[in-house]
């Protein structure tokens, strides 16, 4: 049986230690409304309090329920957030190409990374990632996109194990029960 309470404490300490090494005090992360980003947001809130900035970055390909779930996490845990639509960037890109979902998805991930690093610069903060171990081992991510970050606290947790951890952290049932997506 996995000792999630100690893992939680270890990850919070890891986050604090790694950010302290940079000389910064704030963190920025993307919040999609999915399980991984909800888990990381809760860990970061416990580690950094109000020095956490979550960014929601919808596009025309994002589901409204994902944005709603991200806001639900922010409201439940009193996390400040901002919504920055990547729609203008994505629309400008896809108007001159075919509707290749993989290319659009990868482009969208890279636009989100650019937005996160810009917000991170503005806030004088460090970007925290949300990729779990299963995604990393399977190569399920976009190079220079959603896998780009300075630190990744859940990079050693398999997705199959993450649900139990998420319950301990208090991730809303609406997120625990929804099907995974690449939103």
Residue positions per predicted region:
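Mid-to-C-terminal catalytic subdomains of enzymes
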Residues: 132-136, 143-183
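ATP-dependent adenylation/nucleotidyltransferase module used to activate substrates
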Residues: 1-139, 166
């Amino acid at each position: 049986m996995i000792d999630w309470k100690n893992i939680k404490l270890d990850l919070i300490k890891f986050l604090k230690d790694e950010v302290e090494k940079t000389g910064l005090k704030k963190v920025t992360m993307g919040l999609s409304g999915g399980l991984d980003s909800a888990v990381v947001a809760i860990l970061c809130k416990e580690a950094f309090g109000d020095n956490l900035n979550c960014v929601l970055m919808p596009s025309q390909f994002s589901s409204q329920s994902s944005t709603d779930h991200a806001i639900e996490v922010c409201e439940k845990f009193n996390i400040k957030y901002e919504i920055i639509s990547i729609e203008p960037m994505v629309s400008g890109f896809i108007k001159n190409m075919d509707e290749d979902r993989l290319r659009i998805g990868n482009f969208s991930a890279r636009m989100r990374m650019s937005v996160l690093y810009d917000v991170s610069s503005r806030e004088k903060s460090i970007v925290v990632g949300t990729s779990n171990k299963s995604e990393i081992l399977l190569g399920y991510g976009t190079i220079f996109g959603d896998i780009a970050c300075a630190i990744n606290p859940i990079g050693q947790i398999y997705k199959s194990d993450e649900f139990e951890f998420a319950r301990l952290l208090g991730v809303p049932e609406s997120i625990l029960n929804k099907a995974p997506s690449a939103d």
